[in-house]
Amino acid sequence: MATTSFDANFCAERLKAIGDPHRLKIISALRYGEMTVTDLAELIEAENMTVSHHLKILKYAKVVEVRREGRFMYYRLHEDLVGADSQKSMFLDLGCCRLEVPDRKA
């Protein structure tokens, strides 16, 4: 039997974490840089509380990371996951697969 070089349970948890329309919108928005909850809520047309809930799930799955500046929290895609190919397409390397993050401006 072949062995795998990745943690299937961890990968499944990450896939579950990104498998929500709000979270996919957040990931797409963060492609352009860090944002606050308020910025994200306005951009994806959701309530601040909803965005905070989804960011907590993404943070727990290590898809996003956060930094504090004064009283503001800035969220960004986890730097260990972000990559780009030769066509300047951005992706998240989840360890078991890659998620291409579409350019919403296109």
Predicted regions and their residues:
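N-terminal helix-turn-helix DNA-binding core of bacterial DNA-binding proteins
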Residues: A2, N9-E47, F72-V82
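A general lysine-centric signal
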Residues: K16, K56-K59
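Base-recognition residues in the alpha-helical recognition helix of bacterial helix-turn-helix
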Residues: S28, H53-K56
